[in-house]
Every structure is written in C-alpha cells, then in structure tokens.
A protein has these predicted regions:
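Extended two-metal-dependent nuclease catalytic cores across DNA- and RNA-processing enzymes
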Residues: 1-168
Length: 169
C-alpha cells in the first residue's frame, strides 16, 4: 500500500517531508526554485500555473512559460475548482475565462482588474476575489521560505470598499 511505497521511496531516494503544505505547493516551490533541474509530472491540471518543464503521461516533455502559467492562474481564479473546494466566479467556465483573460497583451494588472470586475458583476467584492485567488494559487519559490508563507497578493489592489454578495432574487 501507500505507506510501504512511501517508506521504500524515502529509503531509495533523497527525500524531504514538508509539513503544513499541500503536495502541489511543494511541487510548485521546488520546481521554481530549481527550474533547470526539475520536471513536473502530475495529473493535477492546477500545476499548469507553474512555469517550467512538465512531463505528460505518454512520456513527452513540454514547457510552460511564465506567461502561460500566469494566464492559467488568473483563469483558474475565475473558473474555480470544485475538487479543491473553491467555487470561483459564478457562471464563468473555461471558455469564458479564456476570452476574459487572453494571452495576447496580458499583464497581471489588467488580469486582476478583469477578475475584480467579474466578481463585482456577481455581487462580490475585491476581498472575496482575493480569497478565491489565494485558494487557487499554487506556491512558487518566492512565496515561501522555510516555515514562512507569504500570501499571494496582486500587483494592484483596487481601492473600492469590500462588499458582500447581494441577495437579489
């Protein structure tokens, strides 16, 4: 089972155990810490927000650029991920998110502005959008130092007051 396999792997290969972090965060941190020495292999689509070299299940490698990773992250903030337990912005699926956050002319400031605007259209404020972004975010090397997490923060935070979801019917 799992425990026997883990014990074998820890004995056969250099290994570490990181407490209080999810496995995908550890992968994101390690991959962005040593991008020349790391290949990510995972069935978790969320890891598309991590730049670097990836391996698919057929054994093919492909590269995800910083731009592609950042675009994927902002789209994920809009679509949410029910498997990971955050809903995203109501009514926005992958195709809509792709139209709202295009790769062409992408900037983080414009992407974040789009995210805020979409959440506000649904009656949510910037604080709620920020919570969704932090739930979507897979940590990168610059966002974690030993036992110290730096919560993701957008480059610009709008100065509008926080709002709560409307109760219109």
């Amino acid at each position: 089972g799992f425990v026997a396999t883990r014990n074998w792997a820890e004995g056969a290969y250099p290994s570490e155990c990181w407490y209080n972090l999810e496995g995908d965060d550890v992968l994101g941190i390690l991959s962005t810490r040593n991008p020349e020495e790391t290949i990510l292999w995972s069935g978790d689509k969320d890891l598309k927000q991590i730049p670097g070299l990836h391996l698919d299940n057929e054994g093919n490698t492909y590269s995800i650029s910083d731009l592609e990773a950042d675009v994927y992250f902002y789209r994920q903030v809009l679509t949410g991920d029910t498997t990971d337990g955050y809903p995203g912005c109501p009514g926005i699926g992958p195709k809509t998110a792709e139209k709202l956050i295009p790769e062409q002319d992408f900037t983080e400031a414009s992407a974040w502005g789009t995210v805020i605007k979409q959440y506000e259209k649904k009656g949510f404020g910037p604080d709620y959008a920020l919570t969704q972004a932090r739930l979507a975010r897979i940590l990168r090397n610059t966002e974690y130092t030993f036992d110290e997490l730096q919560l993701w923060t957008p480059l610009t935070i709008p100065s509008t007051p926080p709002t709560t979801p409307s109760t219109k019917e």
